């Protein structure tokens, strides 16, 4: 599980990814997702919330704890992109949130019809556009030097978001390990 995750990319680029195609139940394609585009509250179906808690623990125990001491801090599921994620930002440093890492799972594939992707900035002139496949997981490092934004142009963009606090995460020293 998560054998294809490249921890060096997490340290140096601010993200890494893995396919969860065989792990995410197809049921997630049938749930109702809150339209996040307007910035309103996020509602989660109780059955989906039960599965989200399980996935949050699986990601914590089988991925993040391989490398870090970590606390799981919550989860959301939405369609579109919340307004505060549309500009380059760092949730921990700019938005003063209590988490410094996210795991996003994309329910919908990025296609020509729905250009939905993440841009990661690792410096002033270095950034990466990450175009997820269906059920891809993208693990975001929110150390001080990394920022990201989400792009949603059209169509469905259903996302599962898991928030974590990783103790001692500071890539300015960690990436040289």
PLM features per residue range, with description:
Residues 8-9, 13-15, 29-31, 73, ...:
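Intrinsically disordered, low-complexity segments enriched in small/polar residues
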Residues 76-145, 149-151, 155-159, 165-177:
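Catalytic core of non-heme Fe(II) oxygenases with the double-stranded beta-helix
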Residues 1-71, 85:
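Non-heme Fe(II)/2-oxoglutarate
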């Amino acid at each position: 599980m998560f054998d294809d995750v490249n921890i060096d990319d997490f340290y140096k680029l601010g993200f890494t990814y893995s396919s969860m195609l065989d792990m995410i139940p197809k049921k997630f394609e049938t749930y109702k997702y809150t339209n996040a585009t307007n910035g309103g509250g996020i509602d989660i179906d109780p059955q989906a919330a039960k599965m989200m808690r399980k996935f949050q623990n699986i990601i914590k125990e089988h991925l993040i704890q391989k490398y870090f001491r970590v606390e799981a801090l919550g989860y959301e599921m939405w369609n579109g992109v919340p307004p505060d994620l549309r500009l380059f930002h760092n949730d921990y440093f700019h938005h003063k949130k209590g988490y410094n890492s996210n795991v996003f799972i994309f329910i919908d594939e990025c296609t020509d019809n729905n250009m939905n992707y993440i841009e990661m900035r690792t410096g002033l002139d270095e950034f990466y556009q990450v175009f997820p496949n269906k059920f891809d997981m993208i693990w975001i490092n929110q150390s001080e030097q990394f920022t990201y934004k989400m792009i949603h142009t059209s169509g469905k963009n259903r996302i599962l978001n898991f928030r974590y606090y990783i103790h001692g995460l500071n890539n300015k020293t960690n990436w040289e390990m």
